[in-house]
Amino acid sequence: MLKEFKEFALRGNLIDLAIGFIIGAAFSGLVQSVVNDIIMPIVGRITGGVDFSNLYWQLSGAPQPTLALARQAGATIAYGNFITLLINFLIVAFVLFLAVKALNKVTPKPDPASTQPPKQEVLLEQIRDLLARK
């Protein structure tokens, strides 16, 4: 059983998946830093110094100066955090789109004329055609 697990774990696809997962986690941290440390301060500057991390609607109690205090006081809707995460998602989606597009350009497309069906399939089609004529 241990041998079977070792063969399963060392198969190419599983290793590729693990490497992709680790790279994805590192990429997520990088994108989060770009959004939080570069893009959101620029957006905040353009919007008159608005700190998106503290944008919220207080649903209960008196207004509070920070999101953390507002959450302690009662229900809140932190729409500023949502805006930040939405920008984060859009950047990740756009980068993945560009990566897939580049990969599709580099990957050779199979020539439809050179791909022939297996012999068994050809024989079965011939048998089907003969039976259909009878």
Curated annotation (Swiss-Prot):
Task: Please tell me where this protein is predominantly located.
Answer: membrane
Query: Pfam families, from UniProt?
Result: MscL (PF01741)
- How does this protein lie in the membrane? Multi-pass membrane protein
Location in or out of the cell: Cell inner membrane
InterPro entries per record:
MS_channel, MSC/AndL, MscL_channel
Recorded GO CC terms = plasma membrane
The alphabetical list of record keywords is: Cell inner membrane, Cell membrane, Ion channel, Ion transport, Membrane, Transmembrane, Transmembrane helix, Transport
For this chain, one GO molecular function annotation is:
mechanosensitive monoatomic ion channel activity
Residue ranges spanning the membrane: these are: 15-35, 80-100
Known role: Channel that opens in response to stretch forces in the membrane lipid bilayer. May participate in the regulation of osmotic pressure changes within the cell.
Assembly and interaction partners: Homopentamer.
Q: Which family does it belong to?
A: Belongs to the MscL family.
Record HAMAP family: MscL
Q: What is this protein called?
A: Large-conductance mechanosensitive channel
Q: What species does this protein belong to? A: Methylocella silvestris (strain DSM 15510 / CIP 108128 / LMG 27833 / NCIMB 13906 / BL2)
